[in-house]
Amino acid sequence: MAGHSKFKNIQHRKGAQDKKKAKLFASLVREISLSAKSGADIQYNPRLRAAISAAKFNNLPKDRIEKAIAHANNKDNYENYFEITYEGIIFDGIAIIVEALTDNTNRTAANVRAIFSKYGGNLVGTGNASFLFDRLGIIKFESKVSTSEELFDAAIELGAEDIELDEEYHVVYTPIKLFTNIIEELAQLFGYPVESYIGWRPRNTVLISDTEKAQKLIKLVNALDDNDDVQRFFGNYEFSEQIYNNLLT
């Protein structure tokens, strides 16, 4: 079992700050609509079930959830979103994988490329950064749902690969082929997770202890976080405790 560290592989996600609430809601609505295109019955659509679970956790109003599902199943709706993955490299071998959901791939590609370029990085071809990561299922529970031992034992019994723990969340990593089954089994024991998705986990991390480089990296990930099309991103870096205390608290 891997102990989770706040300095390890910090993943910047759409924040809960007031100034980002509208953007977070828009992201949740898009994910629900995209998921619902595969069917509106959550019993047979685990991705939609996970999207609704995340929306409820983040207090997306019920009427907006229902409208997002209806929007996806409206035959007169011609709005199409595409899921795109970008891979980027910056200094010291740091790799970042960006997952976007967009209705304009040219716009999103240009914006993501500009962000990397501005802070000393470049987009690279498929596989040139992702080989540094494992692709797997990621299931995130609030830590209050169970003791770490209970969740660990249950998840490992079901075939999970690893678990990271901290005071706020328990994160379960699963093989993709077992992802849906493990969600369902754990949900029966602990309730549905805060969020669940197929994502990326670095095989090794690069320690950032230089202040100037850390500042540049933070600006880059903040710019990604501020982009409406970016859903998630994953990096193979970790900040030293000194950098974390000086710049991130």
Swiss-Prot record:
This is Probable transcriptional regulatory protein OTT_1378. GO terms for biological process: regulation of DNA-templated transcription. The keyword Transcription regulation applies. The keyword Disulfide bond does not apply. Belongs to the TACO1 family. It is found in: Cytoplasm. Keywords: Cytoplasm, DNA-binding, Transcription, Transcription regulation. PANTHER family: PTHR12532:SF11, TRANSLATIONAL ACTIVATOR OF CYTOCHROME C OXIDASE 1. GO terms for molecular function: DNA binding. InterPro entries: Integrase-like_N, TACO1_YebC-like_2nd/3rd_dom, TACO1_YebC_N, Transcrip_reg_TACO1-like, Transcrip_reg_TACO1-like_dom3, YebC-like. GO terms for cellular component: cytoplasm. It holds the Pfam family TACO1_YebC_N.
